[in-house]
Amino acid sequence: MSGWRKIYYKLLNLILKLLVKSKVIPTDPVAELRLDTTRPVFYVLPYNSKVDLLTLRDRCLALDLPDPLDDNEIDGVILPRYVFIDDGPRVFRYYAPKQASVKLFLDYLDLHRGNPSLDIQMIPVSVMFGRAPGREDHKGAPQLRLLNGIQKFFAVLWLGRDSFVRFSNTVSLRYMADEHGTDKTIAQKLARVARMHFSRLRLAAVGPRLPDRQALFNKLLGSKAIEKAVEDEARSKKISREKAQQNAVALMEEIAADFTYEAVRLSDRVLSWTWNRLYQGINVHNAERVRQLAQDGHEIVYVPCHRSHMDYLLLSYVLYHQGLVPPHIAAGINLNFWPAGPIFRRLGAFFIRRTFKGNKLYSTVFREYLGELFSRGYSVEYFMEGGRSRTGRLLEPKTGTLAMTLQAMLRGGKRPITLVPVYIGYEHVMEVATYAKELRGATKEKESLPQMVRGLRKLRNLGQGYVNFGEPISLNVWLNQHVPEWREAIDPIEAQRPHWLPASVNSIAGEVMVNINKAAAANAMNLCATALLASRQRALTREQLLEQLECYLQLLQNVPYAPDATLPQRTPQELLDHALQMNKFEVEKDNIGDLIILPREQAVLMTYYRNNIQHMLVLPALVASMVIHHRQISRDELLRQAAVIYPMLKQELFMHYVPETLPQVLSPIIDELCRQQLISLQDDTLIINPPRIRSLQLLAAGVRETLQRYAITFSLLSANPSISRGALEKESRILAQRLSLLHGINAPEFFDKAVFATLVATLRAEGYINDVGDAVREQTLEIYNLLADLLTPEIRLTIESVSIAALEDTGGADGGTA
């Protein structure tokens, strides 16, 4: 490098250090992109920009990656370590890649011809200052090359702190040389493919241009579906067409987002400051699969679980920092209050009412608006559960918005639509105390500014946050596999509701919930809560708690629930120390040692965190429970009993194992429990290992309350086979409340209406009850006895005595259909 160029770079570098603070995507490119630092690298940038090059250099040096300004010396040949594909924007939109870049590609490929062991890593890198997509109504001449430097100066000045350096997956030049050759044609193809890659990358990061709101409304009003709905509105309400049209516009105003890049930038500053003070870290996993989907041109629909109002902000914040466009978010109309409503609207929220029933105009306007978002290429986010979970478990999915998503596909859009399930987890949910009150019968407080201020004042140390992206579900692929004829229903004008739609929507919704749970995150809080709640006294010695944490960690590491599930990379001692810092537990010291206590007032709140990961530990807990209560049980008998119980667990906890594969699932769990010496295996019989019985009991407690609930329902059903489904749900809930009071069961979901509704629906699906006749008493009694053998004698006695009393109170039988 010449002397004057070194001076120029140094001066420019000084300015950039003052003005630029770039974020790297992914955060750790060496690990996430599997870069081999022992092999030569070759950086590829889209445009000739020294600012981009020096920004890249700064990040490379910070990450201990090779300096792009240094040359590569390979087999005596010296070549630059970077290349610009294009000179930059020109008057004409189409232009070929620089010949210099093609020549450099050719030189690098040529090196591989004479050196079979050489494998250079080509790394595409994009540097972006700001990500404003612009407006659809913006009409401007193509940027002149002369203005590029001036524009770059102002971009650095204004957006230097909002810049990103995005490293893409490496390309093996050895593979290219071996598979495609090393001639000039391949070099030109490499340059063209790189240009296309950067173009897609920019679209994924910036998104399509934003619409002019009024133009969008005019387009919606011109759609045939809304025109028909307006006419129906005028006729049914006996009002003029103009008035009906005004009603439609008012609904659009109520629903539509008013997304602005400036609001996103400002909120990023505020949220970065907020997260750094409230959270000790935000852990993100599997974001690369989402970036790849966006880059491949998929229309992405994010479907996260819903734990807190914080979910809206956290997911958008994470996506923005992963180099992706924040989505348009379906938010409950209850959040449309000042000032939250206008702020959320500018951050991409569009508002949805709790129910569409009885308002055809509203449902039509909403469906058309959602379809327009898809057709324009905006990513969308909605919560399949409909509302925030009050128990920490996933709720039964509400399928209305998903049905509209499939109907949008039936408009014949060109881009594939893919659902991305997202698990969001917290070590502290700010609304958890409110949830507990609501589950005890308190009226839900309406969202408002005073409530928001009170909530913000309570925010303190929130521990760690977790955002895990689950396995995507391509709607196109799903429909091709399950409904091969789905394209026959495509109609670009009218909303379609083919006969296969309801069943398909329900199946896809179930898969989404299962995939969310497959991406669950175990953490210090939910693991400690699981252990302490397993103790009937809600207290363990420090040694017992550490031993139990080790048991859970070993189980989840050696028999993972799912590949996407994540575990804390900490020792049990580190997890306990972190959990104690959250001030949820008390520590009492005596002459023997420390006692970790879960205070009574915290016990109900802690069930929320335990429930976040109950599905990950419920099968080991079931095995432990069977061994404890039977003292010894053959492997075959354990598998038989588990096969009876598992369908109910699967439906309630959205578990992913197929019932037919249960023996293959339980076998490694049994082996792991034997390895940990919690149980012993003698002549294919599982028996208790007395020295480790305390850990086995604590593990078994993870399924204790669930089995009690099942026993309640089967007790009622076997005593009265003709009881109606509605009465069975109601009586089960009443009996569960009684059991909770008599035996001090603190879990609020123990008598939750939705849990029993799911259980009764599962019994119908499994054939225990039906819509036209009685249940088979012998069958239900057999299953009750199976469950009762897994209960303590006092719990069993209470269930049987209270269920008999309940039946006597209702006259012994309910004549409704089962």
UniProtKB/Swiss-Prot annotation:
GO terms for biological process: CDP-diacylglycerol biosynthetic process; fatty acid metabolic process. Pathway: Phospholipid metabolism; CDP-diacylglycerol biosynthesis; CDP-diacylglycerol from sn-glycerol 3-phosphate: step 1/3. This is Glycerol-3-phosphate acyltransferase. GO terms for cellular component: plasma membrane. It is a peripheral membrane protein. GO terms for molecular function: glycerol-3-phosphate O-acyltransferase activity. InterPro entries: GPAT/DHAPAT (IPR022284), GPAT/DHAPAT_C (IPR045520), GPAT/DHAPAT_LPLAT (IPR041728), GPAT_PlsB (IPR028354), Plipid/glycerol_acylTrfase (IPR002123). A motif (HXXXXD motif) lies at residues 305-310. HAMAP family: Glyc3P_acyltrans (MF_00393). The keyword Cell membrane applies. Its EC number is 2.3.1.15. Belongs to the GPAT/DAPAT family. Its main location: membrane. It comes from the Bacteria.
